[in-house]
């Protein structure tokens, strides 16, 4: 069982609530040049269609800051401006109507001396600030204290120091992240931070790596924290198309039952008993049913040992063998079809089951914005 959600203060990032009273949101960051307004909005549209709740955009140059008003206005989801080095872009982002601003206190010039101004500007605009501490860019003062090592304690101290400065100026609409490329250190930092504050926490493993490695690192870290009730919004950082970040983030939350499940494909890992190419069949079924936004579990099994017996919890499935497929519903075989007709038959049965579902169940599933993913089981 998952631990109860950690109680936090509540923030609004545009129309998206962040904190323990709200569902855990999934974020991503655009990879376009922000001053390429059309390209950036197009990528935001793709992310939104995949289920992204909040999007972050970089703002390294004046031309990027000048593009923020149009992007913030036209984006279908809240836009967070990601600010490094130059404090002037914080104020530009606030004036542009961004839903929030992420600041990196480790590399913004003379940031401590500008906190009072930032707090007033953000407070007047009614938007939150995320203090985004990163193991790769800690404040030199903190690094010196911890002998040049970005320890969990160093990350937490940096975040709490900056949050304290904002609080001194009467500003408390703060979210915090303490990211590290090492999932173990990252998890420990968030655990310590959760014990010391009630700020909403944005989870992330920074520099997680390419799609496969990054997915593993983020899944391990997020699973450890979310199962303990820690975490209010997440971003899976991948060296890949940002759309993949949303797919992985959605699946992590679904796997922990922190979002309503939609279509789920379960498949056996295959073995010497398999009498069909399970890998190809599972991919074909996934592709055929992708986008079918219903809470339906479909099993693809390579022999009669794994299905329907081991897949009895599936709503629908197939057990293959001898050039045929046994189609089963809720563990009961309803028909046997030639191998060439398996995918077609599963589509037909999935549509039939979906049509018979309770409209309220369908509405709840539709609201979560999920799509199909393959889940391999033993």
UniProtKB/Swiss-Prot annotation:
Q: Entry's Gene3D superfamilies?
A: Dihydropteroate synthase-like, Sulfite Reductase Hemoprotein, domain 1
User: Does the keyword Metal-binding feature in the UniProt annotation?
Assistant: yes
Q: Where does [4Fe-4S] cluster bind?
A: 268, 271, 303, 310
Q: Which cofactor does it need?
A: [4Fe-4S] cluster
Name the domain of life: Bacteria
Biochemical pathway: Isoprenoid biosynthesis; isopentenyl diphosphate biosynthesis via DXP pathway; isopentenyl diphosphate from 1-deoxy-D-xylulose 5-phosphate: step 5/6
Kindly provide the name given to this protein in its UniProt entry: 4-hydroxy-3-methylbut-2-en-1-yl diphosphate synthase (flavodoxin)
Name of a matching Pfam family: GcpE
Q: Which GO terms describe its biological process?
A: isopentenyl diphosphate biosynthetic process, methylerythritol 4-phosphate pathway; terpenoid biosynthetic process
Q: Which HAMAP family match?
A: IspG
Q: Which GO terms describe its molecular function?
A: 4 iron, 4 sulfur cluster binding; 4-hydroxy-3-methylbut-2-en-1-yl diphosphate synthase activity (ferredoxin); 4-hydroxy-3-methylbut-2-enyl-diphosphate synthase activity (flavodoxin); iron ion binding
Q: What class of enzyme is it?
A: oxidoreductase
Catalysed reactions, semicolon-separated: (2E)-4-hydroxy-3-methylbut-2-enyl diphosphate + oxidized [flavodoxin] + H2O + 2 H(+) = 2-C-methyl-D-erythritol 2,4-cyclic diphosphate + reduced [flavodoxin]
Q: Look up and give the organism this protein is from.
A: Corynebacterium glutamicum (strain ATCC 13032 / DSM 20300 / JCM 1318 / BCRC 11384 / CCUG 27702 / LMG 3730 / NBRC 12168 / NCIMB 10025 / NRRL B-2784 / 534)
Q: What does this protein do?
A: Converts 2C-methyl-D-erythritol 2,4-cyclodiphosphate (ME-2,4cPP) into 1-hydroxy-2-methyl-2-(E)-butenyl 4-diphosphate.
Keywords noted in UniProt: 4Fe-4S, Iron, Iron-sulfur, Isoprene biosynthesis, Metal-binding, Oxidoreductase
């Amino acid at each position: 069982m998952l631990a109860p959600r950690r109680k936090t203060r509540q923030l609004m990032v545009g129309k998206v609530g962040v904190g323990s009273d709200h569902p855990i949101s999934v974020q991503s960051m655009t990879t376009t040049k922000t001053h390429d307004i059309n390209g950036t909005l197009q990528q935001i549209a793709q992310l939104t269609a995949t289920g992204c709740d909040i999007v972050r955009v970089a703002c390294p140059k004046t031309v990027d800051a000048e593009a923020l008003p149009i992007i913030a206005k036209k984006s279908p989801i809240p836009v967070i401006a990601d600010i490094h080095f130059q404090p002037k872009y914080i104020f530009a982002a606030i004036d542009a109507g961004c839903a929030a601003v992420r600041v990196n206190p480790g590399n913004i010039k003379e940031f401590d001396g500008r906190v009072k101004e930032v707090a007033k500007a953000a407070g007047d605009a009614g938007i939150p600030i995320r203090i985004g501490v990163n193991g790769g860019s800690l404040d030199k003062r903190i690094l010196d204290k911890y002998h040049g090592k970005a320890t969990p304690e160093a990350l937490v101290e940096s975040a709490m120091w900056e949050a304290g400065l904002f609080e001194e100026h009467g500003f408390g609409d703060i979210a915090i992240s303490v990211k590290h490329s090492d999932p173990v250190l990252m998890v420990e930092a968030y655990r310590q931070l959760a014990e010391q504050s009630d700020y909403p926490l944005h989870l992330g493993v920074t520099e997680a790596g390419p799609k496969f490695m990054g997915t593993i690192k983020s899944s391990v870290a997020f699973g450890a924290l979310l199962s303990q009730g820690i975490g209010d919004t997440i971003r899976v950082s991948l060296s890949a198309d940002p759309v993949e970040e949303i797919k992985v983030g959605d699946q992590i939350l679904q796997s922990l039952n922190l979002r309503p499940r939609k279509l789920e494909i379960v498949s056996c890992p295959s073995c010497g008993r398999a009498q069909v190419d399970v890998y190809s069949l599972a991919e074909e079924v996934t592709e055929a049913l992708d986008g079918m936004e219903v809470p339906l579990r479909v099993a693809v099994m390579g022999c009669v040992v794994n299905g329907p017996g081991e897949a009895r919890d599936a709503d629908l499935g197939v057990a293959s063998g001898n050039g045929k497929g046994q189609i089963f519903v809720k563990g009961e075989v309803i028909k046997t079809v030639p191998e060439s007709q398996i995918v077609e038959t599963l589509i037909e049965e999935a549509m039939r089951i979906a049509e018979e579902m309770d409209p309220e169940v369908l509405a709840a599933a539709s609201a979560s914005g999920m799509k199909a993913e393959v889940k391999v089981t033993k």
